[in-house]
Curated annotation (Swiss-Prot):
Its EC number is 1.1.1.289. This is Sorbose reductase sou1. Keywords: Carbohydrate metabolism, NADP, Oxidoreductase. The keyword Transferase does not apply. GO terms for cellular component: mitochondrion. InterPro entries: NAD(P)-bd_dom_sf (IPR036291), SDR_fam (IPR002347). Belongs to the short-chain dehydrogenases/reductases (SDR) family. NADP(+) binds at residues 21, 95, 163, 167, 195, 197. Catalyzes the NADP dependent reduction of L-sorbose to D-glucitol. The keyword Oxidoreductase applies. It holds the Pfam family adh_short_C2. Coiled coil: none annotated. It comes from the Eukaryota.
Amino acid sequence: MTSMFSLKGKTTLITGGSGGIGFSIAKAFAAAGSNVGLLYGRNKKALEYAAELRDKHGVQAKAYSCPIENRSAVIETTNQAVEELGGRLDVMIANAGIAIPHLSLEDKNEDIWTKVVGINLNGAYYTAQAAGHHFKKQGKGSLIFTASMSGHIANWPQQWASYHATKAAVKHLARALAVEWAPFARVNSVSPGYIDTDLTLYADENLRKKWKEYTPQARIGLPDELPGAYLYLASDASSYCTGSDIIVDGGYCSR
């Protein structure tokens, strides 16, 4: 049974690879035998992370700087990584994302909305396109989006209209592509709840206290509690699973 979860000899690319969730996924996938490409924006820690994966797990691992909101850059970087990591792409994880609190009525700065949409939604779509060409040529592949519980409900008390909207769109994009790409790829998503990463660092103690109060497990999740869902969706254990979304939120959406 455990062999169904093996990724030995496969290649995985992860956008947002220098973040808490992205690197946690990378560690789990490398431990399962996958070569790993980390696509990152500005955080050059991805270079150190790639070296760590190579040294600890003996897999191929490289880091690539890539502005995820730039379609041409995403496609070019994906093609480069595929060529350098073995010539095929088995798993693509569209994980890059940002959240910027803003007042939807009072905030007249359109730059916030445009930036969040550019990274969270456009970037996810460009990532899918880049991977889809390889999957179609190969006749097989697994695309996994990092959505959010914010795509299911509107978080409170923070005001994240742009984040909520983009993550709901990403979740439905996954379902749409699962239908369109059924002949050659599986497409699914994972919806994390409140996870202790750089994305939530802005929150003061009062806000974090509210998050815990609203979560049935009464705590904020850790990045290392997420990779199991991604590993399942990437592996042969989920060969008949497409168009699904796995919520990992400590029970938040079940209240």
